[in-house]
């Protein structure tokens, strides 16, 4: 998160400027002269920091916006009086803003101080706007003066000002600096800018590649169209726009009589849409990526060159560009937004909501308690009254008192009755019956409103009126009852009650107003619809729904600030649009452009339209045409639209989704919190109800209960069972088999992990268990043991049988797709009919077999008890019935034939991965239920309002001058294309709009299309023009109607639909996680562990041959990379420079360049082949790609040469001799077009170069891997719908100018799929729906009866298209989004946390140490390797050596017998320690748990790999951890000696003391440190390091960190932490130890090269190693300084024969195969201090190490060499390995046990190594050490008086004994420095 911190600081500085001025330390001087005492500055400060000042400025900005909006732009720079007045007003605003800026500058200083005016971004914006305003004003004055002197120049000079004046529109942005919540939204958008920039690069890259491909393939193809012969009139059918044609080939032929295909046409969209040059090609590709108008471009290309293959280009473009890359934007924004919101949440918004709920619950409790109390009072009073009557005495019989008593009693009675009655009311209001009554009334109310429609009968209107009044009175009664029963205070506490009250009051008001006639019923009827909101009352008892509604209301706040931002954004662009296009949208062709910028409201609507993306391209084309068409200045207009579209549609609208996803997660957590409470209650009940069970059993029950909610929302078939996992060593079984718990016993189903994205099959490995034969008999005749039944069972469960059936399912599906929908009786269909019979019989046999095996349906486990089997049965039954009924005319049979389409669904039951995706989709649908409900309610409400507003108003006459149906008769004249010479006579028709609001259902349909953003501008303008009922439209009659649509779009389309999408995404992600709920690893840990297990080392090929090496060196150098990068860029530029109609020279040059580039890239390939050899070269996928491209390019060059050679005879086409009818333009070398693509593909190589984009790409490919089953599901969906479409709509005639035409139809399977793909992208799907509904013309070749020409199509189309659109747009495409958001969360993740993307670095650096990719390196290289990898994975080069070693102790990878560590083990250990996976607690237990988890998640992990990564318990393991632990201990010994030598100046010789000090070191310093290290707690260590370094710096003692392997200076930055050569010179080899270079001034003498040849050096060595210091009780102090002290590494052990090589190898061999299992025995035996020394037991599990190892037996040596040399050789070196003598071992083990390292104490090998290290450090022979140790033990025994301590060693007593022994030598212990 570091990168974001400066912005945060900026924000912190910015925000206080307005609200908290006191915080700002004001600079002492402003503008170099004004001090704080200066009166002018004082005044400015007080004004600027005066609260109302801010408000005044905001109001001024607002007024300025209003002024800008009222301005009316006019064509040709005309003006009216209003505009002139506004321009004068402009000066006033300018003055105000200038004064404000000046005062702020005087108050805060201008630039140089910390918080000066220009240091805030918002102020910079203000300043620029003010400055430009002043500058413009000055220029205008200059213009005026000039125009007075030279009148002609005014026009020219005025233009400059107009451009500058456009900047005024930025003023509304100043509102942002005044509203803090806006800044939060903006900041989260700004934070996302970096990852968004990467995505933008990727999009740009795609656009460039596709643009160049388009340029190569479609250049100049769009300029031919059909003209009438001999004229320039384009020949088109009615309603059809002109489109390209082709003279030959499979393009569009000209069919109209007297027309021909010829060139010279500017092209579609006035020549804007084409691929003739790079710029327009990019524009066209970008327009396709936005999924708006892409099918038009595809159809034009089809018309021009035929429809065989252009679809590949466009479909891939949409899939990659729109579905994938643009969804990344969403991933990034939602990630950023969640982070921003989490910060806000930590301030407790969510908490407040929780508390509020709690409070309300408490309050309800109190209220009911108080009312209960009142009732009790009433009861008491009744009893009291009786006693009062009984005991009333006759003495008080005075009349006055009696009268008074009566009043008092009356009041009392009244109060009592009131209380009783009120309590009764309270009970009534709270009862369920009352609730359902109210719901019933609400439903009736809804019904009465929904029954309204156009042309309804009078009685219905009366009925609705009466119902309205009755229901209103009922609602009023309900409200009053509630108020009385609950009391006003409690009533108004509920938000729903307040809302209810508002609705009722508005209803009463409406009734009064209508009755009195003060208001038209229309405006008020909208109020009546508000009553529908009462429907939301249902949510009261529906927890999850009410939580959803609460979270929606909650997100209104965050949405409000976003809406404000959106509104500002729209205003700014609308104002800018008015400046640019105001008054310019009037063209020659008399067609009115509705989306224009001629006034402010209209500009707002146009900008909003572009924002929703509907038809934005046509608005842009108009803008380009307004500036003179597709030539230089006009094209620049597209920049405005592209920026508007990108910022608005991609960024702002995706923030909506981000907010939605965010809030849903919140609603989920609310619901789950409540569920948790319920569970808690249940658990309490359970434990109360289990008196006779033991505690343990209760806990089992509790656990079971805990596991239950996890499965919620998952269908039972998909419940998870934990796989019992067997390993050779241990069996880890589920401790509570499910049968223990009643009611949890499930059917024997194969387990299916539930997840939306099926894992790669490797992880899923579903072992299907054969379901046993059920107990009962099948068909009452076959018993379970019957041979026939057993045989059937065997067949049914055989894999070959399943595969056989799957094959048949596939074949039968293919047969369905191959049918001919038009000609039912064709030969093809007859053949397919026979096949159908075969398939059906096979399926019937399968079902009979299965029923025989499992029984039909009577008993448990029978065939029909499974939903998927019922589906199978249905499909087969349908096939059988339709075979029986032959005639296809019967409508029943038609439906049955269509139902055969469900056959592919049978595959679901057989492909497990697919089955589980389907289940996931069902779960998602179930979970989405709530959202659907809320959305439907809102939709219904808007539909009712729509009916009130627009019923019967969408009629029109095609002759616009006629207003009613009566007038709309006869004929009228039309001028074609506005040309008065061309007249045409047409009949008048009274038309009803396709989408209208005449009744609630039509209204809901119309609104649904609006919510999909398709065709809503047409509907909107239709509504704006609407007049009275049954009247024609009036232009711009009611512009305010736009508000209805805009509110609907924002509420439903932006917000609810996004929440819907968000819900799908959240559900899928949760489903993905449920699979791993009880695996204890989170997603990131899983991904990293999976990477560590699956990764393989890279080969790093370095040639041996010197010449080859030279080539290799060149090819791998970065300069070569940059050179190739530059060449590819050049190649791109050359390709982009081509254009249509280019000159001959240009053609020639581009051909030569192409050859040159091909030669260069071929050379690159040859060089690389030489450098890497074939195996190395083809090992890298990028190289394979290069290779293919080079081969393709060479073929391309050869073909081009042949082509030019044959050009004289007409190119390659003429080889066949058919050249007569080919014009040169047509033969545009199409044969070589395919190979031309290879030129373009070179660009893709750029991807391998850019780091950020490469990571994106990597994740991209990874997310493709996650999609196989999702893709399969989509394929199935498309298949089924395509086949249904062919059966239903295949016979509709293809009519040009309608939506079912030559390019878009259901007549063949591929066409049907393409049409569906078009619908899925939302391209005018509602028009296709209308074109497929009933009453369409039939295809002339189909089999319709005479007189039935117009009977094709069916109204089933409504269900078909709506269901398809819903499934596609909301579910399926969101699966894509969910997968992408899952995989791309790294884009916004905190980079300091280790993630899978960090792990590639490890592979790269490992390859340098292991170039052959053997997967092993010397353990001594590990430390250097890890210090070269940056954190969070490695240690980084600044990590002190000691910390690095300690981390290695914590990582504890297994060490192989040859002294190497493996690749996977090292990577796994790194991941494990970095992410703290099972690092706490007992290490062995943790290892076993982790093994079990890995086996459970990745079932196919080989045991070998698992043992490598986590050795099993029984293993005699040697680990790197122990290796480094001995060195840490040794290092601590040395520090003590060093300290003692410094203190005394000489080295004491008393051996026992030395040994004792060494033991104290182990116990007090080394052991705790190692213990902490192993438990992974390194934070304290690092803090210590830091503290010590600082302390040392203060004292100016430049000491060195105690480095183990050479010295590392922690305070001087190493200039070169590791010279490249050192990769192979192992700095850790102890036989010839290499020191890293030193830079510290402390050491005066150099390090000795070899102690044998240099006597002085030898003396020094002895001196340096001879320093022994004793343990001091001042433990903490020592811990403090243990790291920073001046110490020398002992340079090499090879010098002293006795303690040298042999000893080392001896000690480390002892680390060998003797390990943990004997821990218990050791602990038991070793710690018996009373035992005589000579009886000290040998380390129990250890083979006596004195025996020399047999020849060939492998033992580990720490120098990394195999020790299988002959024993003689060893003795000749004088290094016979010895066991540590018992006394030493005993003492060391005691020390280790006391230090808390029991496991290491139990490891005999480790003890041996430690004792050797002790001897080395003290520079004593092991025998001497043993003698000293024996003395120590004797001394201790004498002190203890030979008293033996029973049992295990008590830490206190042993310490006591040591202390007493030590007391005698107290004088020798030096204090610590």
From Swiss-Prot:
One GO location term (cellular component): T-tubule
InterPro entries (UniProt xref): CAC1F_C, GPHH_dom, Ion_trans_dom, VDCC_a1su_IQ, VDCC_alpha-1_subunit, VDCC_L_a1ssu, VDCC_L_a1su, VDCCAlpha1
Short sequence motif named Selectivity filter of repeat III, residue ranges: 1012-1015
Region (Interaction with calmodulin): 1522-1542
UniProt keyword terms in alphabetical order: Calcium, Calcium channel, Calcium transport, Calmodulin-binding, Cell membrane, Disulfide bond, Glycoprotein, Ion channel, Ion transport, Membrane, Metal-binding, Phosphoprotein, Repeat, Transmembrane, Transmembrane helix, Transport, Voltage-gated channel
SUPFAM superfamilies per record: Voltage-gated potassium channels
Chain positions covered by the region annotation Binding to the beta subunit: 357-374
Any Pfam family matching the protein: Ion_trans
Localization per record: Cell membrane, Sarcolemma, T-tubule
Per-repeat ranges for III: 786-1068
Phosphoserine: modified positions: 393, 397, 687, 1575, 1617
Biological role: Pore-forming, alpha-1S subunit of the voltage-gated calcium channel that gives rise to L-type calcium currents in skeletal muscle. Calcium channels containing the alpha-1S subunit play an important role in excitation-contraction coupling in skeletal muscle via their interaction with RYR1, which triggers Ca(2+) release from the sarcplasmic reticulum and ultimately results in muscle contraction. Long-lasting (L-type) calcium channels belong to the 'high-voltage activated' (HVA) group.
Protein name: Voltage-dependent L-type calcium channel subunit alpha-1S
Native species: Oryctolagus cuniculus
Gene that this polypeptide is encoded by: CACNA1S
């Amino acid at each position: 998160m570091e990168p974001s911190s400066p912005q945060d600081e900026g924000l912190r500085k910015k925000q206080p400027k307005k609200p908290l001025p006191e915080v700002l330390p004001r600079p002492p001087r402003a503008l170099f002269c004004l001090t704080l005492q200066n009166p002018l500055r004082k005044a400015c400060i007080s004004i600027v920091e005066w609260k109302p000042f801010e408000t005044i400025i905001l109001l001024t900005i607002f007024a300025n916006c209003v002024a800008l909006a009222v301005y009316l732009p006019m064509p040709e720079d005309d003006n009216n009086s209003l505009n002139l007045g506004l321009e004068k007003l402009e000066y006033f605003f300018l003055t105000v803003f200038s004064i404000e800026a000046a005062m702020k500058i005087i108050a805060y200083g201008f630039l140089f101080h910390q918080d000066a005016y220009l240091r805030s971004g918002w102020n910079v914006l203000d300043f620029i706007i003010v400055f430009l305003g002043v500058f413009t004003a000055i220029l205008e004055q200059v213009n005026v003066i000039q125009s007075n002197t030279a009148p002609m120049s005014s026009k020219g000079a005025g233009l400059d000002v107009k451009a500058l004046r456009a900047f005024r529109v930025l003023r509304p942005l100043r509102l942002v600096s005044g509203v803090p919540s806006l800044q939060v939204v903006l900041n989260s958008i700004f934070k996302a800018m970096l990852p968004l920039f990467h995505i933008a690069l990727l999009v740009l890259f795609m656009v460039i590649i596709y643009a160049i491909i388009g340029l190569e393939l479609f250049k100049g193809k769009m300029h031919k169209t059909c003209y009438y012969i001999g004229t320039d009139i384009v020949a088109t059918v009615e309603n059809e726009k002109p489109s390209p044609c082709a003279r030959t080939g499979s393009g569009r032929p000209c069919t109209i009589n007297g027309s021909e295909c010829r060139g010279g046409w500017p092209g579609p969209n006035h020549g804007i849409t084409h691929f003739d040059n790079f710029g327009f090609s990019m524009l066209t590709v970008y327009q396709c990526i936005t999924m708006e108008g892409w099918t038009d471009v595809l159809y034009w290309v089809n018309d021009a060159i035929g429809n065989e293959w252009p679809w590949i280009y466009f479909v891939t473009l949409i899939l990659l560009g729109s579905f994938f890359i643009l969804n990344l934007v969403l991933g990034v924004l939602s990630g950023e937004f969640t982070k921003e919101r989490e910060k806000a949440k930590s301030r407790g918004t969510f908490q407040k909501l929780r508390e509020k709920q709690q409070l309300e619950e408490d309050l309800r409790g109190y209220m009911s308690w108080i009312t209960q109390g009142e009732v009790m009072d009433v009861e008491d009073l009744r009893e009291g009254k009786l006693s009062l009557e009984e005991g009333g005495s006759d003495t008080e019989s005075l009349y006055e008192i009696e009268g008074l008593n009566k009043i008092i009693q009356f009041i009392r009675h009244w109060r009592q009755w009131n209380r009783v009655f009120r309590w009764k009311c309270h009970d009534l209001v709270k009862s369920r019956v009352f609730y359902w009554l109210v719901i019933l009334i609400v439903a009736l109310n809804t019904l009465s409103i929904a029954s309204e429609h156009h042309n309804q009968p009078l009685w219905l209107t009366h009925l609705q009126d009466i119902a309205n009044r009755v229901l209103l009175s009922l609602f009023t009664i309900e409200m009053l009852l509630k108020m009385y029963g609950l009391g006003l205070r409690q009533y108004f506490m509920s938000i729903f009650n307040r809302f209810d009250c508002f609705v009722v009051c508005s209803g009463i008001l409406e009734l009064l107003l209508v009755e009195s006639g003060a208001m038209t019923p229309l405006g008020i009827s909208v109020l009546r619809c508000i009553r529908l909101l009462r429907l939301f009352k249902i949510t009261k008892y529906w927890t999850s729904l009410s939580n959803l509604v609460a979270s929606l209301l909650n997100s209104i706040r965050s949405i409000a600030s976003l809406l404000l931002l959106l509104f500002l954004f729209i205003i700014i662009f609308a104002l800018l649009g008015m400046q640019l296009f105001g008054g310019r949208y009037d063209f020659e062709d008399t067609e009115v452009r509705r989306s224009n910028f001629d006034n402010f409201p209209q500009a707002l609507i146009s900008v909003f339209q572009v924002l929703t993306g509907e038809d934005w391209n046509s608005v842009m084309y108009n803008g380009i045409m307004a500036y003179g068409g597709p030539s230089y200045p006009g094209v620049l207009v597209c920049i405005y639209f592209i920026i508007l579209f990108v910022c608005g549609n991609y960024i702002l609208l995706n923030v909506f989704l981000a907010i939605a996803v965010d809030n849903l997660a919140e609603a989920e957590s609310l619901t789950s919190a409540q569920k948790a409470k319920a569970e808690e209650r249940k658990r309490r009940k359970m434990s109360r109800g289990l008196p006779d069970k033991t505690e343990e059993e209760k806990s089992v029950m509790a656990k079971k209960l805990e596991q239950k909610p996890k499965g919620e929302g998952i269908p039972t078939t998909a419940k998870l069972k934990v796989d019992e996992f067997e390993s050779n060593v241990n069996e880890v079984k589920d401790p509570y088999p499910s049968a223990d718990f009643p009611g949890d016993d499930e059917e024997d189903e194969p387990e299916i992990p539930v997840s939306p994205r099926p894992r790669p099959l490797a992880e899923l490995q579903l072992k299907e268990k054969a379901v046993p034969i059920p107990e009962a008999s099948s068909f009452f005749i076959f018993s379970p043991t019957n041979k026939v039944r057993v045989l059937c069972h065997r067949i049914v469960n055989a894999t070959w049988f399943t595969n056989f059936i799957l094959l048949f399912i596939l074949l039968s599906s293919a047969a369905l797709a191959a049918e001919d929908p038009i000609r039912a009786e064709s030969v093809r269909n007859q053949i397919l009919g026979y096949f159908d019979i075969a398939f059906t019989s096979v399926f019937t046999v399968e079902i009979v077999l299965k029923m025989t095996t499992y029984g039909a349906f009577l008993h448990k486990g029978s065939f029909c008890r499974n939903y998927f089997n019922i589906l199978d049965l249905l499909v087969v039954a349908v096939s059988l019935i339709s075979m029986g009924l032959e005639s296809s005319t019967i409508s029943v049979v038609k439906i049955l034939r269509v139902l055969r389409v469900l056959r592919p669904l049978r595959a679901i039951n057989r492909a497990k991965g697919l089955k589980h995706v389907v289940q996931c989709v069902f779960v998602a649908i179930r979970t989405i239920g709530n959202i659907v409900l809320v959305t439907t309610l809102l939709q219904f409400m808007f539909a009712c309002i729509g009916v009130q507003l627009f019923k019967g108003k969408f009629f029109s006459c095609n002759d616009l001058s006629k207003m009613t149906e009566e007038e709309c008769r006869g004929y009228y004249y039309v001028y074609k294309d506005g040309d008065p010479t061309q007249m045409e006579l047409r009949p008048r028709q009274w038309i009803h709009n396709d989408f209208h609001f005449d009744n609630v259902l039509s209204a809901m349909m119309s609104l649904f299309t609006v919510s999909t953003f398709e065709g809503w501008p047409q509907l909107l303008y239709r509504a704006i023009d609407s007049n009275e009922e049954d009247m024609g439209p009036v232009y711009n009659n009611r512009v305010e109607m736009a508000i209805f649509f805009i509110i609907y779009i924002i509420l439903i389309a932006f917000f609810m639909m996004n929440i819907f999408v968000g819900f799908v995404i959240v559900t899928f992600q949760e489903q993905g996680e449920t699979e791993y709920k009880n695996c204890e690893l989170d997603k990131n840990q899983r991904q990293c562990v999976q990477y560590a297990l699956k990764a393989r080392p890279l080969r790093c090929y370095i040639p041996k041959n010197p010449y080859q090496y030279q080539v290799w060196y060149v090819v791998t150098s970065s300069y070569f990379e940059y050179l190739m990068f530059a060449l590819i860029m050049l190649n791109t530029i050359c390709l982009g420079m081509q254009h249509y109609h280019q000159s001959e020279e240009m053609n020639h040059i581009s051909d030569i360049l192409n050859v040159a580039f091909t030669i260069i890239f071929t050379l690159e390939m040859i060089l690389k082949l030489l450098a890497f050899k074939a195996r190395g070269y083809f090992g890298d996928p990028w190289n394979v790609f290069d290779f293919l491209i080079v081969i393709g390019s060479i073929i391309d060059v050869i073909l081009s040469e042949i082509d030019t050679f044959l050009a004289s005879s007409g190119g390659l086409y003429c080889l066949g001799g058919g050249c007569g009818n080919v014009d040169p333009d047509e033969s545009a070398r199409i044969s070589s077009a395919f190979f031309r693509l290879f030129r373009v593909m070179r660009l893709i190589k750029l991807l391998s170069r850019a780091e950020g984009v490469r990571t994106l790409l990597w994740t991209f490919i990874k997310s493709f891997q996650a999609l196989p089953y999702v893709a399969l599901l989509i394929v199935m969906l498309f298949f089924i719908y395509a086949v249904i479409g062919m059966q239903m709509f295949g016979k509709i005639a293809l009519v040009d100018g309608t939506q079912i035409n030559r390019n878009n139809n259901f007549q063949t399977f591929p066409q049907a799929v393409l049409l569906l793909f078009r619908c899925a992208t939302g391209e005018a799907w509602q028009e296709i729906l209308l074109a497929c509904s009933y009453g369409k013309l039939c295809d002339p070749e189909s089999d319709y009866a005479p007189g039935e020409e117009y009977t094709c199509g069916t109204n089933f189309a409504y269900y078909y298209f709506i269901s398809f659109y819903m499934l596609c747009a909301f579910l399926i495409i969101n699966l894509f989004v969910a997968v992408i958001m899952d995989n791309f969360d790294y884009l916004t993740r905190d980079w300091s946390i280790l993630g899978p993307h960090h792990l590639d670095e490890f592979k790269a650096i490992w390859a340098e140490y292991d170039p052959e990719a053997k997967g092993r390196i010397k353990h001594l290289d590990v430390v250097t390797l890890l210090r070269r990898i940056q954190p969070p994975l490695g240690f980084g080069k600044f990590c002190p050596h000691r910390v690095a070693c300690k981390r290695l102790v914590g990582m504890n990878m297994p060490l192989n017998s040859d002294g190497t560590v493996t690749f996977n083990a090292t990577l796994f250990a790194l991941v494990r320690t970095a992410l703290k996976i099972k690092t706490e607690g007992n290490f062995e237990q943790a290892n076993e748990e982790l093994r079990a988890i890995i086996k459970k998640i990745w079932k196919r992990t080989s045991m070998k790999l698992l043992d490598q990564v986590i050795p099993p318990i029984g293993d005699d393991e040697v680990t790197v951890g122990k290796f480094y632990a001995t060195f840490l201990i040794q290092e601590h010994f040395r520090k003590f000696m060093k300290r003692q030598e410094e203190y005394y100046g000489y080295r004491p010789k008393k051996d026992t003391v030395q040994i004792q000090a060494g033991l104290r070191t182990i116990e007090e310093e080394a052991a705790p440190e190692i213990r902490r290290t192993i438990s992974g707690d390194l934070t304290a260590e690092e803090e210590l390091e830091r503290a010590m370094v600082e302390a040392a710096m203060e004292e100016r003692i430049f000491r060195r960190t105690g480095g183990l392997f050479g010295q590392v200076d922690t305070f001087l930055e190493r200039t070169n932490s590791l010279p490249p050569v050192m990769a192979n010179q192992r700095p850790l080899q102890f036989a010839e130890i290499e020191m890293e270079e030193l830079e510290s001034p402390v050491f005066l003498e150099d390090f000795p090269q070899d102690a044998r040849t240099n006597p002085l050096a030898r003396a020094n060595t002895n001196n340096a190693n001879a320093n022994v210091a004793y343990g001091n009780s001042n433990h903490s102090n020592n811990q403090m300084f243990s790291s920073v002290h001046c110490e020398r590494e002992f340079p090499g052990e090879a010098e002293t024969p006795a303690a040298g090589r042999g000893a080392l190898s001896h000690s480390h061999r002892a680390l060998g195969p003797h390990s943990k299992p004997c821990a218990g025995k050791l602990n038991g035996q070793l710690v018996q201090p009373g035992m005589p020394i000579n009886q000290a037991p040998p380390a129990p599990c250890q083979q006596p190490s004195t025996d020399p190892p047999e020849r060939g037996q492998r033992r580990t040596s720490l120098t990394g060499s195999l020790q299988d040399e002959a024993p003689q050789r060893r003795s000749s070196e004088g290094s016979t390995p010895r066991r540590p003598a018992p006394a030493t071992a005993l003492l060391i083990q005691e020390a280790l046990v006391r230090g808390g390292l029991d496991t290491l104490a139990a490891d005999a090998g480790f003890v041996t190594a430690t004792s050797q290290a002790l001897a080395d450090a003290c520079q004593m022979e092991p025998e001497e050490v043993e003698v000293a140790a024996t003395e120590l033990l004797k001394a201790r025994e004498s002190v203890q008086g030979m008293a033996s301590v029973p049992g295990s060693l008590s830490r206190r007593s042993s310490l006591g004994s040591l202390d007493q022994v030590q007391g005698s030598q107290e004088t020798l212990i030096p204090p610590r420095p």
